[in-house]
Structures are given as structure tokens and as C-alpha cells.
Curated annotation (Swiss-Prot):
Subunit and interaction comment: Homodimer.
EC number(s) stated in the UniProt entry for this protein: 4.4.1.21
Cofactor: Fe cation
Organism field: Clostridium perfringens (strain 13 / Type A)
Molecular functions per Gene Ontology: iron ion binding; S-ribosylhomocysteine lyase activity
Name of the molecule in the record: S-ribosylhomocysteine lyase
Length: 151
């Protein structure tokens, strides 16, 4: 099997919440694409709820783009501990943290979930505003760091 960057990370030595630049790729035409690990909860200790994580995905899709022009995608991790963000350009981790703090703060102000209907969402019933707010609040209270390894 090809070496996968995320499998090389020692998950026993990280301290969530954090943002980590997981890699940069340069395409054949010179396009730069960055990938970030937005870790919300501690691997192998905590999980984001399915409904809360799905709702956060909907909010982050919009709010992160309010602060970052070159977002390609934000996707939930299969391990349910955070999200991956991909963007064009070599963006600084501090800019991602600032956008994420802004986005999670905006989640706390919301009263309805964007695109939570069968026309716009493939799992429209798998949402919870309450759980999304709870996850956002927890991450903000714990503070998002750019230092991800425990010393």
C-alpha cells in the first residue's frame, strides 16, 4: 500500500484541539494545494457525534469560506475526531486557526442548519444544532493550538 500521511502521524502523542498542516502538493501546472488536519477531539479517547459532526460540516462549509477565499473542501474524518480542509495556496496555520475560531463562534449564534433538507443534503435527518453547538463550544473553550504533539 502507498504511504498515507495521516497513518504516519503518531495519534498517541497529539493533543487536541489543534490545526496541523498535513501536507502541500504541487500539481503538474504549478497549482499549490494545502491539506490541514482540524482536530477537534482527542484521538482514541473521544468522538464527535454523527449528527453534530454532520451539522458542523454544513456550517464550516460556509463560514470557513467567509474568511478563506481558496477553500476547496472541508470534509469530516472517518475516525470522527475532526475535519480535513483542503485549499489552494500555501496558507499559514495561524490563518486557518483564525478562520476556524470565527466559524465555530458563528455556529454558536445559529438558529437553523443550512441545507438540511432532502434536496440539498444526502442525509437530511442526520443533523443536530444542539450537538453542533456543544462540539463548537467545547473546542473554543479548550483553545485551538498550532502545537499538536505532546511534549
Amino acid at each position: 500500500m502507498v504511504k498515507v500521511e495521516s497513518f504516519e502521524l503518531d495519534h498517541t502523542k497529539v493533543k487536541a484541539p489543534y490545526v496541523r498542516k498535513a501536507g502541500i502538493k504541487i500539481g503538474p501546472k504549478g497549482d499549490i494545494v494545502s491539506k490541514f488536519d482540524l482536530r477537534f477531539v482527542q484521538p482514541n479517547k473521544e468522538l464527535l457525534s454523527d449528527k453534530g459532526m454532520h451539522t458542523l460540516e454544513h456550517f464550516l462549509a460556509g463560514f470557513m469560506r467567509e474568511k478563506l477565499d481558496d477553500v476547496i473542501d472541508i470534509s469530516p474524518m472517518g475516525c470522527k475526531t475532526g475535519f480535513y480542509l483542503t485549499s489552494f495556496g500555501d496558507i499559514d496555520v495561524k490563518d486557518i486557526i483564525e478562520a476556524l475560531e470565527y466559524s465555530l463562534s458563528k455556529v454558536l449564534e445559529q438558529e437553523e442548519i443550512p441545507a438540511a433538507n432532502e434536496l440539498q443534503c444526502g442525509s437530511a435527518k442526520l443533523h443536530s444544532l444542539e450537538l453542533a453547538k456543544s462540539h463548537a463550544k467545547q473546542v473554543l473553550e479548550n483553545g485551538i493550538s498550532d502545537k499538536f504533539y505532546v511534549e
